[in-house]
From Swiss-Prot:
Belongs to the UPF0597 family. Pfam families: SDH_alpha. It comes from the Bacteria. PANTHER family: UPF0597 PROTEIN YHAM. GO terms for biological process: L-cysteine catabolic process to pyruvate. This is UPF0597 protein LCA_0156. InterPro entries: Ser_deHydtase-like_asu, UPF0597. Coiled coil: none annotated. GO terms for molecular function: L-cysteine desulfhydrase activity.
């Protein structure tokens, strides 16, 4: 195996992982569970949570899995009472119904507080838990489970260098040196046994979609797209591939944002990005009766493309990255429909000229709408590309080459929307 292939596979294994619940409140639950693992008395006297503005934005409205309630107070209480920090972003996957009264009592007792930290980090979480005997503080930055500091009273348990406020991981730094052609060639040519693990994304996220169709989560957007035919307002999903892609992706997001206890396979630290990169590819694979190898290669191409594009974006920002995740899906769907590398480039260029720049105004049930928007853009972009049509580079942020366009999208998210984030949070906190 070449060194480049090893780096690509490591990027997939680092960036495509299961997560139960929206990853920002789950990072707080992970922090609380980490603290509790160091306490022996465990009679909680206080839990203090401090998070960066982007984490606060993404935790205000989204449901904490298994609790039926949103917010950081509930997330911290859930992690403290029912969390297992050893399983990372699946920290509260084992939460039981019998835990719920204790969790909600703690969350609403006044013992748990959450505030915005005055830090420049895109992603920062600090949790302090006091019991009758000890005080433990954990600090996380850079990624959702990256602990750089852990203290118990005056004892330092973990003391790593704090990541720079906008630092990129090793995987992101590697991806930034690559190009889309290298991503495409890897997904097409890497021995299948090296990629087989990517099938889990298909399995997990389709199960989440089915849960969204079965239960009334959030906006019930996925259900409503199929149900539109009852009102003579649409064709439903049975005979409409585009609608089916949108409905399945929206249903999975409905479930995730609505508090389902099933894990999503995430991408770039986001379940909704993972859903967006996965579901359209899975639906397309079913439509063309793809082989297992074609499905796996398409998922690997989709997720690695999404990771490549996201490597130029902040881990959290005002840029809704379901759109960049859907660009990954576009590549995977083009491959399944016997398209070429050039067709995939054209599909992504078409998307860049469409909905790139959709804002992230925090996690919540409306994320399903944004997932649907991104997948709809993907369908239009691929449809044009497969018919030989591409938006000319005289238009907007569409550049002469695919990699220039991707770098431009990175600039849009990193520089262009920098001042947008605090305005969004101010509106959210003062309405």
């Amino acid at each position: 195996m070449s060194l480049q292939s090893k780096h690509f596979i490591q990027a997939l294994k680092n960036g495509v992982v299961p997560a139960t619940g929206c990853t920002e409140p789950i990072a707080v639950a992970f922090g609380a569970a980490t603290c509790m693992a160091q306490l022996t008395n465990r009679e909680i006297q206080a839990i203090e949570v401090h998070v960066s503005p982007n984490v606060m934005k993404n935790a205000l409205a989204v449901m904490v899995p298994g609790t039926g309630e949103p917010g950081l107070l509930v997330a911290a209480a859930a992690g403290a009472i029912a969390g297992d920090a050893t399983v990372g972003l699946s920290v509260i996957e084992g939460l039981r119904a019998t835990d719920l009264p204790t969790i909600l009592d703690l969350a609403h007792s006044g013992k748990v507080t959450a505030k915005t930290a005055l830090v420049p980090d895109d992603l920062y979480v600090e949790v302090t838990i006091k019991d009758l005997e000890n005080t433990v503080t954990v600090a996380i930055a850079g990624s959702h489970t990256n602990i750089f500091s852990l203290k118990k009273d005056d004892q330092i348990l973990i003391d790593h260098p704090r990541p720079a406020a906008h630092a990129s991981s090793e995987s992101k730094q590697f991806l930034q040196t690559m190009n889309f052609k290298a991503v495409w060639d890897f997904a097409m040519n890497e021995p299948l046994e090296h990629l087989r693990f990517m099938k889990e994304a298909h399995t997990l996220n389709l199960a989440l979609a089915q849960d969204g169709f079965t239960h009334d989560y959030g906006l019930q957007l996925g259900q409503s797209i199929n149900g539109a035919k009852r009102n003579h307002f649409g064709s439903g999903t049975e005979n409409d591939l585009g609608n089916r892609m949108i409905a399945y992706a929206a249903a999975a997001s409905d479930a995730r944002m609505g508090g389902a206890q099933l894990p999503a396979m995430s991408n770039s630290g986001s379940g909704n990005q993972g859903i967006t990169a996965t579901i359209p590819v899975s639906v397309a694979a079913d439509a063309v009766q793809a082989t297992e190898e074609q499905l796996i290669r398409a998922q690997a191409l989709s997720h690695l493309t999404a990771l490549y594009i996201h490597s130029f974006l902040p881990v959290l920002s005002a840029f809704c990255a379901t759109d960049s995740a859907a660009m990954g899906a576009a590549a995977g769907v083009v491959y399944l429909y016997d398209g070429t590398y050039e067709d995939a480039c054209h599909a992504i260029q078409n998307m860049a000229g469409d909905a790139a720049g959709m804002i992230c105004d925090g996690a919540g049930c409306a994320c399903a709408m944004k997932v649907a928007t991104a997948v709809s853009s993907m369908y239009r972009g691929v449809n044009l590309a497969l018919q030989g049509i591409v938006i000319p580079n005289s238009n907007g942020i569409v550049c002469p080459t695919i990699d220039e366009t991707i770098h431009g999208i990175g600039r849009l998210g990193t520089e262009g929307l920098r001042e947008t984030d605090p305005v969004i949070l101010d509106i959210m906190l003062n309405k």
